[in-house]
């Protein structure tokens, strides 16, 4: 197989060199990852990590993107992080990113400090698993639009410079672990709902490692179109959540309406071409 084409876009980075065998495997422009929330059971519950590893391996993914509560459950059942890393390595899988919900962005200093301690714990887990990234969504500052937030204490952050300083502190926290937090866009949130907001926070954080976590559905939900993506450097994208959405207005669509790539109306061809032109060669994570 020399190349793979999807949605009219050739996903291989280039043909084999003249000295290579014609049957040499293609070098793909992107890598492929499974966000573990994609394969929850019929009740919406997470599956055990052992099962998630098997699913990802059998489907041919290169990496998984587990949620921290799944790791918590694994540890509570008697597993250890070194053992989990061995399981992943035996399956030929990497951990591309951890999905956690630490309140790093909130204005309340006491809550933010607790959030940073929680983030530090997640970063330690990530480091032990060889994972380079931790998702940093605006949990606690969605304006009560997330079930993970207490609506009595969930206030939007409108001062993006202040948010950039809080992200600076979060990046500093990750440096001893060699784990970079990713500014994650949540389209339903009243904080960090647009591509420009995430980019502003990363750009003004005074951190050269700063990076963001875009998501096809969340960009649509939050009001961004995809014409801003060419402004990004490939190193500014830590991982890209890949999905699709049906023809539902932004103000009515919900997370539950997300569909598999190709089953909706998102301009995936445009997005893939843009990412390839940028030189992004990281993970597309199915969520």
Language-model region placement:
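Boundary/entry segment of secreted carbohydrate-active catalytic domains
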Residues: 24-46
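Acidic-and-aromatic substrate-binding clefts and catalytic sites of carbohydrate-active enzymes
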Residues: 40-47, 67-80, 103-107, 113, ...
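Acidic/histidine-rich catalytic cores of soluble enzymes
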Residues: 63-64, 95-98, 164-265
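Short, well-ordered coil/turn segments that N-cap beta-strands
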Residues: 26-32, 60-62, 89-96, 128-133, ...
């Amino acid at each position: 197989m020399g190349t793979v084409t999807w949605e009219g876009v050739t996903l291989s980075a280039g043909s084999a060199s003249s000295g290579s065998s014609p049957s040499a495997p293609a070098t793909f422009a992107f890598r492929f990852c499974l966000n573990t929330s994609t394969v929850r059971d019929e009740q919406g519950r997470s599956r055990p990590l052992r099962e998630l590893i098997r699913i990802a391996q059998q489907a041919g993914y290169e990496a998984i993107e587990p949620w921290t509560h799944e790791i918590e459950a694994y540890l509570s059942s008697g597993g250890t992080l070194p053992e989990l890393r061995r399981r992943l390595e035996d399956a030929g899988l990497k951990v591309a990113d951890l999905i956690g919900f630490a309140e790093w962005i909130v204005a309340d200093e006491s809550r933010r400090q607790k959030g940073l301690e929680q983030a530090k714990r997640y970063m330690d887990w990530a480091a032990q698993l060889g994972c380079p990234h931790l998702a940093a969504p605006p949990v606690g500052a969605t304006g009560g639009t997330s079930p993970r937030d207490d609506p009595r204490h969930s206030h939007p952050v409108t001062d993006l410079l202040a948010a950039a300083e809080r992200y600076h502190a979060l990046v500093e926290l990750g440096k001893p672990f060699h784990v970079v937090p990713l500014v994650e866009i949540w389209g339903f949130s009243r904080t960090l709902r647009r591509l420009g907001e995430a980019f502003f926070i990363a750009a003004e954080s005074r951190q050269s490692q700063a990076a963001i976590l875009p998501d096809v559905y969340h960009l649509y939900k939050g009001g961004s179109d995809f014409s801003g993506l060419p402004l990004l450097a490939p190193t500014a994208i830590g991982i890209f959540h890949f999905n699709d959405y049906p023809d539902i207005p932004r103000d009515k669509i919900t997370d539950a309406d997300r569909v598999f790539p190709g089953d909706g109306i998102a301009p995936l061809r445009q997005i893939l071409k843009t990412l390839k032109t940028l030189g992004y060669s990281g993970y597309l994570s199915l969520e």
